[in-house]
Amino acid sequence: MQSRQRLAGLLVLGIVVAAGHAPPTSGQASERVRPADLHPETGNRFPPIRRDALNEAEKKLYDTRGVTDGFGPAALRLYSPPVAESMTAVNDYLRRKSGLEPRLVELAILVTAREMDAEYVWTSHEPAARKAGLEQSIIDTVKFRRDTSALGEEERVIVELGRGAIGKHKVDSETFARAVKLFGHQGVVNIASLIGDYAATAILLNVADQHVRNVSLLPVP
């Protein structure tokens, strides 16, 4: 009986693979079933904000953030314009004016997305990280939670800061000391704030149950 069941299972698996639908492995991303409460235009639980319903100040913010279809955190934050305005300013400083290399900015964002299992953030920023010059081997180290010993000093510290602050809820003394040596006190505050910024974004997207447009690039359950 057991041999028959095993044979039947192998036959089913063979049919699935032959049809081009191999079951996902830990290294593959798959689409989640979309819940009934998602809005079809936004891919989240919120209806889209219509530009013509906004006042002039809100329209300026809408246009500045490139909000067009209701997808993503910029659109969601428009439900609270003061939050949108203040967080836009903070994000702009941390990403573009803090002095941190663009590739390291993207690395900090990716490790945050990985530790928060934030599919939307990861799927948006993996291509941006490659464009900024972050090597695929480093991206994969973060994506698949691999050991960091092969990374450069700066990259390793940023990954360990993110893993400690979010995953372990604790950054150890050695990691902190290495971070200060490499980036200075202000740099560490900037990196920690960048991690916090995208952790907050991940929480907002989680509450909204924001789905990606197509297929997630992040393997999560």
Where are these regions (language model features)?
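Bacterial N-terminal signal peptides that target proteins for export
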Residues: M1-L10
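Hydrophobic alpha-helical segments
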Residues: P24-P221
